[in-house]
């Protein structure tokens, strides 16, 4: 019996190769991608790249997501394969093979498949390892020398991950065999799914879950809240999608059946009857396609927007080659730190910008009435941020004089409520809004608060001392900024950046009243060289992971669509043969198949685009933390991604439809 199960295992893989080819291809690609991620994460040459810490962190997180996604896809593909082999396994049981023999046979099939796919997957991963490393270097703006070395620990890690996945696969298949008798196995592939119960309740639950998920996505107003709400919104939308596909498709089909003018046409009747026959299975498959498609779109839109927007972020976060920001430090001290740096480096200044301002968070807002946090409420996340400048500083930055009187202010704001106001009250002190200003800090003074809150404002006051007196006792912070562009910024950029860090650290230590921990008064150094390294490393790594996650999600989408078409093709073949015998010609068969396929496979695409539309606001807030501050750019990226995905979906639809028609027409 041992030899018999050996022969059966090998022959079964050969006979069912049409089912196993996509399964094997998906597994090989998943193994190769996991190998590449593991190899890159362990690569010692990452330390030589600018922004190495950011790259390692992103790759480490990506490896976990890739491994989890790979496991889900392999298990899902296996379920389709075993479903289509139910009659075969039932026949073996009827012929005398016991369940332990069937389990032994399936175990050996899995061992053979795992050995072949692991061998090929690791081989493909090793083959493309250097190329992918060069691609990562290109994304983060480094030279593309192929410096990639074989890591001994890469193979054991990949083996552990996929041995666990294949072991789980064996357990799932074994449990499936144990709970079914031979008669059930022979009929399992043919029987239709049972009609769902409590359809009305399911429909309302689905609408409620999806509606609340959409509400969460649209109602968040700052990036931090968006991150905290994102996963809950995703879970609710996934739950709502499955419930609506399961119950909603049933309700719609039953309504169509009641519409006699539509239902009693040969093509419509056959298509609807076939969908009703497999109602529950179609619902789960379609919902899965919709969710996977949404994952592809969200991942690609987010990753591509981050990569496309990195230049804008660099321009706003590091507008100068070298700069020093003083927190609760006067402008003279900040200027002294940058002047000391210029003397030691001998750099010639092309441009110099200086600014002194204060900033605070808003605790409450009632139309144009603002309340600032008190000093003991500093740690509370503000609803919005205000940066306050004197009109003399405004004139230095813009060259324009506002000529404000004692009760007048100039205002630039992202707050929709304040944009239409004629006056502004700050802690009971009322000011007339004399001028509505443009963003006068852009390219001059960095405002890093934009990545924390999308609601921020710049206030220009006639006299800073008077304004500070009016808000005394509140949680405000003074800041000074001095930034310079030098004649040759690329010369000794790293050395100069390190020197500026040392100077600011020394100046910070010399400030009076220092305590352990984060000082109340301190200097912060920034250079475009360091900013580019950090941003390129993080953004390039994020885009790199986004591409590969999108490939995995797309792979899952294609697999589900392909196996769905194949499995339904085999199920429909016998029924269409019967219909042809009772008078349905070939043209009617093709029209009926076409209508069914169109209905089934374009509904998930519509849902995916709807999900993306409602998630767009939340995605835009999340990517703001990474520096995507240009809404127009993100919109263009989204349109391009949707167009490319639509074309890819059409291609998959055309290819899988041919397989379906070929099987049904046999």
What feature does the model see in each segment?
Residues 3-7, 179-193, 570-574, 661-666:
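Short cytosolic juxtamembrane segments of multi-pass membrane proteins
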Residues 313-314, 320-325, 331-555:
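Basic-flanked hydrophobic alpha-helices used for secretion and membrane insertion
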Residues 18-45, 53-90, 110-124, 202-204, ...:
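Hydrophobic alpha-helical transmembrane segments of multi-pass inner-membrane transport and secretion
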Residues 39-53, 122-155, 211-228, 603-666:
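Short helix-loop junctions at transmembrane helix boundaries
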Residues 112-256:
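Hydrophobic alpha-helical segments
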Residues 1-31, 195-200, 209, 244-293, ...:
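N-terminal Sec/SRP start-transfer signal
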Residues 154, 235-254, 312-337, 626-662:
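Alpha-helical transmembrane segments and their immediate juxtamembrane interface regions
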């Amino acid at each position: 019996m041992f030899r018999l199960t050996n022969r059966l295992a090998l022959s079964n893989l050969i006979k069912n190769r049409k089912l196993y080819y996509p399964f094997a291809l998906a597994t090989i690609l998943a193994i190769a991608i996991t190998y590449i991620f593991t190899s890159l994460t362990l690569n010692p040459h990452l330390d030589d790249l600018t922004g190495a810490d950011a790259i390692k962190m992103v790759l480490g997180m990506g490896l976990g997501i890739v491994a989890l996604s790979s496991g889900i896809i392999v298990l899902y593909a296996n379920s389709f394969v075993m479903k289509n082999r139910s009659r075969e396994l039932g026949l073996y049981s009827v012929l005398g093979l016991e369940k332990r023999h069937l389990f032994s046979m399936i175990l050996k099939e899995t061992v053979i498949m795992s050995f072949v796919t692991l061998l090929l997957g690791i081989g493909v991963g090793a083959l493309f390892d250097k190329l992918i490393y060069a691609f990562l270097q290109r994304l983060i703006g480094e030279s593309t020398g192929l410096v990639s070395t074989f890591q001994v620990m890469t193979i054991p890690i990949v083996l552990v991950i996929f041995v666990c996945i294949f072991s789980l696969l064996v357990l799932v298949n074994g449990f499936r065999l144990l709970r079914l008798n031979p008669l059930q196995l022979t009929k399992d592939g043919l029987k239709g799914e049972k009609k769902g119960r409590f359809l009305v309740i399911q429909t309302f639950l689905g609408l409620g879950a999806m509606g609340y998920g959409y509400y969460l996505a649209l109602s968040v107003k700052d990036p931090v809240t968006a991150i905290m709400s994102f996963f809950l919104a995703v879970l609710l939308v996934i739950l709502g999608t499955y419930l609506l596909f399961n119950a909603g498709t049933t309700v719609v089909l039953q309504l169509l059946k009641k519409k006699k003018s539509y239902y009693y046409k040969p093509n419509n009747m056959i298509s609807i009857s076939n969908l009703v026959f497999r109602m529950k299975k179609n619902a789960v498959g379609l919902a899965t396609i919709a969710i996977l498609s949404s994952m592809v779109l969200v991942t690609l839109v987010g990753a591509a927007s981050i990569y496309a927007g990195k230049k804008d972020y660099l321009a706003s976060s590091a507008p100068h080659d070298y700069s020093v920001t003083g927190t609760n430090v006067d402008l003279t001290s900040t200027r002294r730190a940058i002047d000391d740096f210029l003397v030691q480096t001998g750099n010639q200044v092309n441009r110099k910008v200086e600014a002194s301002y204060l900033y605070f968070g808003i605790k409450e807002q009632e139309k144009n009435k603002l309340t600032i946090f008190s000093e003991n409420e500093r740690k509370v996340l503000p609803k919005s941020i205000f940066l306050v400048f004197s009109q003399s500083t405004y004139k230095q930055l813009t060259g324009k004089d506002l000529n404000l009187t004692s009760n007048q202010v100039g205002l630039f704001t992202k707050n929709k409520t304040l944009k239409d106001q004629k006056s502004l009250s700050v802690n009971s002190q009322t000011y007339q809004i004399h001028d509505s200003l443009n963003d006068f800090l852009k390219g001059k003074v960095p405002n890093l608060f934009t990545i924390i809150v999308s609601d921020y404002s710049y206030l220009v006051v006639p006299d800073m001392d008077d304004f500070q007196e009016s808000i005394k006792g509140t949680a405000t912070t003074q800041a000074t900024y001095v930034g310079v562009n030098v004649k040759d910024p690329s010369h000794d950029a790293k050395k100069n950046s390190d020197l500026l860090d040392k100077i600011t650290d020394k100046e910070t230590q010399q400030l009076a009243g220092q305590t352990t921990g984060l000082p109340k008064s301190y200097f912060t150094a920034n250079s475009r060289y360091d900013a580019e390294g950090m941003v390129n490393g993080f953004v390039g790594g994020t885009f790199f992971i986004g591409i590969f996650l999108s490939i995995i999600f797309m792979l899952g989408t294609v697999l589900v669509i392909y196996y769905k078409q194949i499995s339904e093709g085999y199920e429909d073949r016998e029924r269409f043969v019967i219909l042809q015998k009772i008078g349905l010609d070939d043209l009617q068969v093709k029209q009926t198949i076409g209508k069914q396929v169109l209905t089934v496979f374009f509904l998930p695409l519509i849902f995916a685009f709807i999900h993306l539309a409602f998630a767009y606001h939340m995605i835009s807030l999340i990517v703001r933390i990474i520096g995507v501050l240009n809404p127009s750019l993100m919109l263009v990226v989204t349109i391009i991604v949707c167009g490319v995905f639509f074309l890819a979906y059409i291609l998959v639809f055309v290819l899988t439809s041919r397989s379906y028609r070929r099987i049904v027409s046999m």
